[in-house]
UniProtKB/Swiss-Prot annotation:
It comes from Arabidopsis thaliana (Mouse-ear cress). Residues 143-146 are annotated as: G3 motif. This is Phragmoplastin DRP1C. Residues 32-301 form the Dynamin-type G domain. The gene is DRP1C. Disulfide bonds: none annotated. The keyword Cell cycle applies.
């Protein structure tokens, strides 16, 4: 069956591991907060430090005026065999044993200053102190800064609320046992500790009341109403404590002797003699130790459940952010190629419609290209005035006889050249969409988020490939336009009705305007014929340009976006492969933290399993 020593020792061990990992409570549920603890709460000058020293049987806590305890002190007491030497160990100095308890006090002060500086600031980072002695019981106590009502010189005005918030963060946890220290020579209703305990534990199920300074109460008064639970009832009995006087402290009266003196006080007291067996620091320590053991037994199932849940959550997060990468070049190359394929899958999903974005390419063909073609200045180029000018220039000094073929060709060539602008604009628009899809695909590839260097390399390689595809596509679409100029569709003109238009008779029987081969009507007819031919070419290019762009850019992007990159990676040495897999420092730090926390939880589970519970 699990003994008190093994149970409390188990919790102590897990607490120390939590502190090493920086788990000392805070927002949300943590293993630290799931562990049963005893928090010592009291106002300044309530005798809180003296109670702790009485329980330990040693002078070891810093003393002075104002706020002395400025960091939580996790005090783990380990009972040893009679006759063994007492010593103390700090978690931050694990290889150093302190046999001189004056040195323990000095180390507490120094370790406090290491975090808070020489100021009177406070910190919620705990100090872990273990004391091994035959004069203690197995017990863990957390000494918290004393509650205060005013700030002293050198402290911010917020110190009063800061201390209360820190103390409250401990005592409001359902697994915290509250040891509320109240001086008996003051009205219990004004006790800072009792007031706070009442707020966080209104039923008193988690609160142990301790009345100090019973020996210096005014004559004719006593603390029986409190100790017997009449003035303020708790679920657990009140315990009276008689601490050493200042004179005893100055004389360095031995703590063991002070314990005997305390017990004699209760046994010989007319007021408290009938309560003597349930008074004093020794009884308080045993009472707390027994209760802590009971609470630990009750809480172990929920602690195990929390540990198992935390292990599952940590493993899930490690899987999400990725496990550490192997250091050999083969594994690194395999990892890089797998990450490239993951990016490639996301990119293709965008193009194929599995993700949004690919539809923008169709928008270029269906809206942007037709709109650009409609805006071409054919009306100006094929105006009667310009047609006449071009035809006349083509004829030169010898006018055409029947049809101005050279004029036609010049007008057609000039018109077709306008298509180069929309063709190149279509190539550039699709290139822009593809680049944007590369950017989106990089950001949406979860596996790449831990490798910013590789993500940048892939993006650069993909964009370089897209530029090559764009250049080839631009050459192709310009060839398509040039092909329309290089060989005209003669059949189109043969089918045209080339007879001059019949005009209504001139009322004055004047000759018809089109009788003159150089009349406006004649040039309008030429412009109309060229316009009809250009419309046919426009329809052809409206269909062929998208085909060329898709073939040269979209199709190649799907087929071979990273082919050149694959070849480059395959030739890299181990060091360069490793550099490509450099991770985000914050991610590496997070993985390290998770790995340590996972180790903590697994070790805690093993430690709990190792305890015999039957």
């Amino acid at each position: 069956m699990a003994t008190m020593k093994s149970l409390i020792g188990l919790i102590n061990k897990i607490q120390r591991a939590c502190t090493v990992l920086g788990d000392h409570g805070g927002e949300g549920m943590s293993l630290w907060e799931a562990l049963p603890t005893v928090a010592v709460v009291g106002g300044q000058s309530s005798g809180k430090s003296s109670v702790l020293e009485s329980v330990v049987g040693r002078d070891f806590l810093p003393r002075g005026s104002g706020i002395v305890t400025r960091r939580p002190l996790v005090l783990q007491l380990h009972k040893t065999e009679d006759g063994t030497t007492e010593y103390a160990e700090f978690l931050h100095a694990p290889k150093k044993r302190f046999a001189d308890f004056a040195a323990v006090r000095k180390e507490i002060e120094d370790e406090t200053d290491r975090i808070t500086g020489k100021s009177k600031q406070i910190s919620n980072i705990p100090i872990q102190l273990s004391i091994y002695s035959p004069n203690v019981v197995n017990l863990t106590l957390i000494d918290l800064p004393g509650l205060t009502k005013v700030a002293v010189d050198g402290q911010p005005e917020s110190i009063v609320q800061d201390i209360e918030n820190m103390v409250r963060s401990y005592v409001e946890k359902p697994n915290c046992i509250i040891l509320a220290i109240s001086p008996a020579n003051q009205d219990i209703a004004t006790s800072d500790a009792i007031k706070l305990a009442r707020e966080v534990d209104p039923t008193g199920e988690r609160t142990f009341g301790v009345a100090t300074k019973l020996d210096i109460m005014d004559k004719g008064t006593d603390c029986l109403d409190v100790l017997e639970g009449r003035s303020y009832r708790l679920q657990h009995p009140w315990v009276g404590i008689v601490n050493r006087s200042q004179a005893d402290i100055n004389k360095r009266v031995d703590m063991i002797a002070a314990r005997r003196k305390e017990q004699e006080y209760f046994e010989t007291s007319p007021e408290y003699g009938h309560l003597a067996s349930r008074m004093g620091s020794e009884y308080l320590a045993k009472l707390l130790s027994q209760h802590l053991e009971t609470v630990i037994r009750q809480k172990i199932p929920s602690i195990v459940a929390l540990i198992n849940k935390s292990i599952d959550e940590i493993n899930a997060e490690l899987d999400r952010i990725g496990r550490p990468i192997a250091v050999d070049s083969g594994a690194q190359l395999y990892t890089i190629l797998e990450l490239c394929r993951a990016f490639d899958r996301v990119f293709k999903e965008h193009l194929d419609g599995g993700r949004p974005g690919g539809d923008r390419i169709y928008g270029v063909f269906d809206h942007q290209l037709p709109a650009a073609l409609k805006k071409l200045p054919f009306d100006r180029h094929l105006s009667t005035k310009n047609v006449q000018k071009v035809v006349s220039e083509a004829d030169g000094y010898q006018p055409h006889l029947i049809a101005p073929e050279q004029g036609y060709r010049r007008l057609i060539d000039g018109s077709i050249s306008y298509f180069k602008g929309p063709a190149e604009a279509t190539v550039d628009a699709v290139h822009f969409v593809l680049k944007e899809l590369v950017r989106k695909s990089i950001s949406e590839t979860e596996e790449l988020k831990r490798f910013p260097t590789l993500a940048s390399d892939i993006a650069a390689a993909a964009n370089e490939a897209l530029e090559r595809f764009r250049d080839e596509s631009r050459k192709t679409v310009l060839r398509l336009v040039d092909m329309e100029s290089s060989y005209l569709t003669v059949e189109f003109f043969r089918k045209l009705h080339l007879e001059p238009e019949k005009e209504k008779p001139n009322p004055r029987n004047a000759p018809a305007p089109n009788a003159d081969p150089y009349s406006d009507n004649h040039f309008r007819k030429i412009g109309s014929n060229v316009s009809a031919y250009i419309n046919m070419v426009c329809d052809t290019l409206r269909n062929s340009l998208p085909k060329a762009v898709v073939y040269c850019q979209v199709r190649e992007a799907k087929r071979s976006l990273l082919n050149f990159f694959y070849a480059q990676v395959g030739r890299k040495e181990k060091e360069k492969l490793g550099a490509m897999l450099d991770e985000d420092p914050q991610l590496m730090e997070r993985r390290g933290t998770l790995a340590k926390r996972l180790e903590l939880y697994k070790q805690a589970r093993d430690d709990i399993d190792a305890v015999a519970w039957k």
